[in-house]
């Protein structure tokens, strides 16, 4: 492959207190936490919406709201609240989640699974970010890190508006891939490939019958049952 030397150019600059790279759930919570403490915060996300794997992967929130099943003898109680629980609470108000449901099988890394409506999740998190005054930079790619003497001073972004430099006092890498850290020169290891997995949603079927069929063929690895429509919380 040939190399191309890009000519030097001047780009617009903005300054904030905190830059959060990645708008998945971790990035949303980090940006909200910073903004709610009074920090001028910018959230950079390359998709046109927030939510990351929860919204595009159909994974629900394997949320670590508690891990009592993975550690026998640990008290059964909710240990994570704060902003994550605020998101769930607001989703419940608009019918966007069935709430925390206890894992019945496959609880080696969580004890509850929180299924969400992906479109309402996008709406709720975007609304919360706007309410907190976070500068949303959607459809924006993290192109590079600006590093001086081993310290990240800023980032270069690319969007439909062109390239931009953002300088800040603090940076959070919530890309899921360590993109900001890698661009800044941090060591990293290429992960092993993960098998492709698909999620699906179905309606007007017998959940019990489907589960019985899967269980009879030893095809159930994880099992969690949320509230049905109309059931009390």
Stretches with model-predicted labels:
Residues 1-18:
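Extreme N-terminal leader/targeting segments of oxidoreductases
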Residues 7, 33, 39-40, 45-144, ...:
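Conserved N-terminal/central alpha/beta ligand/cofactor-binding core
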Residues 14-16, 161-170:
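Core beta-strand elements of the Rossmann-like FAD/NAD(P) dinucleotide-binding domain
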Residues 18-42:
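N-terminal Rossmann-like FAD-binding beta1-loop-alpha1 element of flavoenzymes
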Residues 21, 166-176:
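Short hydrophobic core segments
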Residues 23, 159, 175-176, 184:
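Glycine-rich, N-terminal phosphate-binding loop of Rossmann-like dinucleotide-binding domains
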Residues 66, 178-233:
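Rossmann-like dinucleotide-binding core of oxidoreductases
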Residues 146-165:
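Conserved beta-strand-loop-beta-strand element in the redox core of flavoprotein oxidoreductases
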